[in-house]
UniProtKB/Swiss-Prot annotation:
This is Conotoxin Sr5.7. The lineage of its organism: Eukaryota, Metazoa, Spiralia, Lophotrochozoa, Mollusca. The keyword RNA-binding does not apply. It comes from the Eukaryota. It comes from Conus spurius (Alphabet cone). One of its GO terms (cellular component) is extracellular region.
Length: 62
């Protein structure tokens, strides 16, 4: 239960990050959508790994 507030704060920070997609997408921008999804997934994995390094108890329940 001690890890829950940490994950909630991290998820709120990720959700409140400014979006890069400020312009309308064109036909040429469609392949970039998967790139942005991959970047968000990689960022989320890095945050979880960082949290596991600091709060080892979080990783024991995975």
């Amino acid at each position: 239960m001690r890890c829950l507030p940490v994950f909630v704060i991290l998820l709120l920070l990720i959700a409140s990050a400014p979006s890069v997609d400020a312009q309308l997408k064109t036909k040429d921008d469609v392949p970039l959508a998967s790139f942005h999804d991959n970047a968000k997934g990689t960022q989320h994995k890095r945050i979880i790994n960082w949290c596991c390094l600091i709060f080892y108890q979080c990783c024991l329940r995975r």
